[in-house]
Amino acid sequence: MKREFISLVAVRLACLLGMFLSAWPSGQAEVAQPDSADGLFALDNFLEVKIQMSPLYWDRLRYQYRDITQERKPGEAFKDNYTYLPALVSINGESIGPVGLRKKGLIGSSSTQRPSLKIKFNFAKKGGRYLGLDRLTLNNNIQDPSLVKQYLSYKLFRKAGLPAPRCNFARVFVNGQYLGVYTNVESVRKPFLKRVF
């Protein structure tokens, strides 16, 4: 009975997705415009991201959390208790200089051992960018043992003509410790919006 219910729900969701995608007006598709960050998100570019920061700052970052029980007005966002801390980053051996690093996520992806991360390139230098981007998002995929759901979802959206962030994969190290494979996701900010709209 439970299995039939799950199957029925899955079929209905697939039908709804199909109806949504088929109703999307043509001409709204994302136009592929090459930019300097294209290579950063190429699927065949398995990034190696090495982060160096004070162990004190790393522990502070890892143990920050958002209180999901806090009182909020309807529609009000959670108070952002995550703060950017100074770090040095290299991507595929290229030093990016001082950046800001913070934890990201709410419940599942806010692990203390392997947190999802945001890298802010304009933390130490106003207007600082890397390949035209002001930040990167590294998702830990803790809730996805396959590690590919986010990548495949965004690829499906783009194939359907919907704007979606570019992404690929990265091996992430902090202070020499290997944290694992993360999804490197284009942050939805001004550079993304200018690229797709």
Predicted features, each with a name:
Residues 12-23:
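Bacterial N-terminal signal peptides
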Residues 24-197:
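Phosphate/dinucleotide-binding and metal-coordinating scaffold of catalytic cores
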Residues 2-14:
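Bacterial N-terminal signal peptides that target proteins for export
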